[in-house]
């Protein structure tokens, strides 16, 4: 007798998900190494090697630092009244005027950089009884001696240097930045030759602040033929406030003010060339794409940039758990469902069906469950980017040698932040990967349960992701199962009849040895019971005598 399962009265339907021969290893909360069909790299580890000039306005400092451009060094006159989003300082920048220092260099540089402009307004300061527009051979403007264009070097007039007391109110509705300085002669002779008094003094005040500087006379290392120095200071005058300058010598006076603006402009040291291209994120190494949430190119950034982390790679799962086929089976060489392994031949969807019936074999993707999984995964990368991208910039931190402890503390804080973000990145990606794998597994289980509920008693779960259908199920029937229109009542009687026939045949053929052994055991038991009963009967009648001795 032929098995009903081997003729046209049954069919096999398997459910599965796609797989690839070589997947990608990702990390989850529960597993450091789990293979998925697809993953996206989250760490940007290289730059373009050039700084893009769009959408940010990049100002190339060339051979000028920002402070030299601010003061008006003769070789930096081209930067007068310039504006920028990012001022790029080059390693070959140099000063070519009177040697100077800025006691609070980092603060002034940061203040001017964030303002994003060198717009300068000249004001009519009145300096009575002194000689203005001093110059030096150390600061050539053309063939003649010159000086910083934004500063006015005041020296004695004749043999006198009167006490200067000048006020300048701020009647505008914006902050004004005044740059001024104090000259430190190299000798007492130079001091009296320039300012008459043996010791000068400069006091600059507003209602909110006051600075008093006394020159330090003494020789310093020679720079551009000078052993004297100028110290540069700065004062911000708020609207309605008044600038007061008082001095009896050594004053390097302002010629006007810089108009301060609030913004997100900045300055960066870089030797990367500036090119015509588009990039939101800039590092000293060059521009980098910001389509990833993390980067390990450089800690210093400008613009909307990925978060800096220590890791070289972090992969976000964008596909399901990968279970490659264990061997080449052919389409139905050894039919198996998702519980055993994935299907490497399925390219038109993530989930699908394979069937074998009287009309042959076939395969089709389930687009609904595939789309449901893809929709949930697609937004993951954008959400991670939104959580991590810097909306502003991470500026360079600079401190003088005196502020070494502050610098050490700042470095410790920055390193701690990087460690924290690197750890957060690991956890965030592991959580997202765990969620991706769980949801793709869930969609597979949902599809399997949906199919089980349709087939009911008309089919049997084979335990490997497949169903044995106990009725004739042609391609139209298979399609109705896939699209959810299958009516199990139509096939119920046929399925029950075939199931009983198949189970009966399986019982006769598959369990014959078991039945024989069970029958033999029962026969032996009955024989022993009859023999024991006969002995007891005979003992009662006296035909058999049994003596028990102790």
From Swiss-Prot:
Keywords: Clathrin- and caveolin-independent endocytosis of virus by host, Clathrin-mediated endocytosis of virus by host, Disulfide bond, Fusion of virus membrane with host endosomal membrane, Fusion of virus membrane with host membrane, Glycoprotein, Hemagglutinin, Host cell membrane, Host membrane, Host-virus interaction, Lipoprotein, Membrane, Palmitate, Transmembrane, Transmembrane helix, Viral attachment to host cell, Viral envelope protein, Viral penetration into host cytoplasm, Virion, Virus endocytosis by host, Virus entry into host cell. It holds the Pfam family Hemagglutinin. Palmitoylated. GO terms for biological process: clathrin-dependent endocytosis of virus by host cell; fusion of virus membrane with host endosome membrane; fusion of virus membrane with host plasma membrane; virion attachment to host cell. It is a single-pass type I membrane protein. The record marks 329-330 as: Cleavage. A lipid is attached at residues 539, 546, 549 (S-palmitoyl cysteine). Residues 1-514 are extracellular. GO terms for molecular function: host cell surface receptor binding. It comes from the Viruses. It is found in: Virion membrane; Host apical cell membrane. Glycans are attached at residues 8, 22, 38, 165, 285, 483. HAMAP family: INFV_HEMA. Major glycoprotein, comprises over 80% of the envelope proteins present in virus particle. Binds to sialic acid-containing receptors on the cell surface, bringing about the attachment of the virus particle to the cell. This attachment induces virion internalization either through clathrin-dependent endocytosis or through clathrin- and caveolin-independent pathway. Plays a major role in the determination of host range restriction and virulence. Class I viral fusion protein. Responsible for penetration of the virus into the cell cytoplasm by mediating the fusion of the membrane of the endocytosed virus particle with the endosomal membrane. Homotrimer of disulfide-linked HA1-HA2. This is Hemagglutinin. It comes from Influenza A virus (strain A/Duck/Hokkaido/7/1982 H3N8).
